[in-house]
Amino acid sequence: MRTDQNKILCSYYNDPNPLVLESGQKINEHQIAYETYGKLDKNKSNTILICHALSGDQFVASKHPITGKGGWWNRMVGPEKPINTDRYFVVCANVLGGCMGSTGPSSINPENGKTFSLDFPVITIADIVNAQLRLIEHLGIDRILAVIGGSMGGMQVLEWAASYPKKLVSAIPVATSSRHTAQNIAFHELGRQAIMADPDWKGGNYSETGVSPTKGLSIARMTAHVTYLSEASLTKKFGRKLQDKKDLGFGFDADFQIESYLRHQGLTFVDRFDANSYLYITRAMDYFDLEITHKKNLTEIFKGTRNRFLVVSFTGDWLYPTSENLMIVRALSAAGADVSFVDIDSDKGHDAFLLEEPQFDKTLDGFLSSVYSSLG
Amino acid sequence: MNNYRKDLSSIVSLVNQGSRVLDVGCGDGELLEYLKKDKEVIGQGLEIRQDRVNKCVAKGLSVIQGDAAKDLSLYPNKSFDCVILSQTIQATGKPKEVLSELIRIGRETIVSLPNFGFWEVRLNLFLTGKMPITKRLNENWYETQNIHLCTIADFVNLCDELKINIKKTITFNSKKIKTFKEKPRAIENVIAEEAVFLLTS
């Protein structure tokens, strides 16, 4: 049932059982906020689990309670869309460590009644997936038809396929990597340093002052946002166009449209995102290395898997480039897995997976339909 | 039955039941579908064109978008029971390297190709003095994908040079299909329009 907790209207699952984390620490009880679309069929065989990316949330195809905007993947999820809610039961949960209703650093620690802040344990992608598994079991679903996600969502997809292959029919990692590269970590570190350099961060304890480190968080968002685009898309959209003026201002106001755009991105982000959550989730991504977590090489991890895989990359994505996605394909092929791979021609950068890319829609639609019909 | 269908059915006849097959340059997945149905193979395709990959994926085939010239290195040694290159070798930039890769990846390799030594092709060149345009080779020299055309004899020589073993050859023209243990007779280089080779290292 959907309830309204902290002004976030969605479904909630309160998991009473302790969750043992990859670090060895434990969360005694936790809550997962999620959204569902469509209906679970009689055999409970039509579930598609969508894993969101760093700045995403459970509102994949419904109005965001804070921004009032439509879902982040509205164009992909809905009736008659590739992830067809007339046919599939779609589940999307806010990640553990998130700030849209799932337990995270901005939640109250039940042991002392205070906000967790930096007392929240460091979590990993595997921990996020383990919490999702509990939710899926709570919903009475034995086997998921497809788990799909882009970017950090794709990492969760890979972790699902590595840890719980029997819980899945198919896995669709999109624009992702089997481990975070030095460049990926470097950009995240810029964001974290920006947050921690904000005097309002107060060593993470800003919940006590009621003033959050919005400057730092918005700079983190601005930096990250540039990495999601491409030179081609920036040039096409902004070029060197000036913002509401004819001549250079010879100062440091936002002269260029790109500056104004980035400032807007930063400012609106802080309304819906928690700075500490940003630290924890980027850390989880940085720690992601499937081979380290599973103590095997990629090929061995997937040896003997019966899952069907569709790996998708985008030619203009320099953050999680085609070569990183091909490493996954290479390992899956070597493991003898049933794998398809498409490299979608796009100049939109990493964000392409969220944007209008008709070839991606067609590929996804075709793959999901064939997986669905193969179940008879 | 046209020659294209003969080419596919000859290939299918050489593939073992239930084997793991890679079709390099799989197009719309016609051969893979045929193999899945007739021989219950576990099939995988490699195809460079996006629209064709999409068609395959929609049919439930597993296909990797990639280029035979560089992406065959994805696959470990002997990772497939059978690797197929159907009507494609003459369109590759480096046929010798591609052939070596196929032999490395597959326990068996099947290659089919149009025979440039076919008498109609020879006659066409002899009479017109221009690059032959036939039913099978129907594009001008400046438009054709076939940049490395060869004859049956040329291909057999390349196999000898690379110490590749020809286990079986099927040749055909519009009238006849013939099967040879190992290499075909020399006359096939004149009378066969196409050939299918079963190769091992």
Residue locations for each model-derived region?
Chain B
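Class I SAM-dependent methyltransferase SAM/SAH-binding core
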Residues: E30, Y34-D71
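S-adenosyl-L-methionine-dependent methyltransferase catalytic module, highlighting the catalytic core
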Residues: E97-E101, E108-S201
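Alpha-helix C-terminal capping/helix-to-coil transition sites in glycosyltransferase folds
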Residues: Q17, K78-S79, I105
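Class I SAM-dependent methyltransferase "Motif I" SAM/SAH-binding loop
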Residues: G25-G27
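Conserved alpha-helix/loop element of class I SAM-dependent methyltransferases that forms part
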Residues: N2-G18
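A short SAM/SAH-binding and catalytic strip from SAM-dependent methyltransferases
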Residues: C82-K94
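A short acidic, Gly/Pro-enriched loop at the edge of an enzyme's catalytic core
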Residues: S73-C82
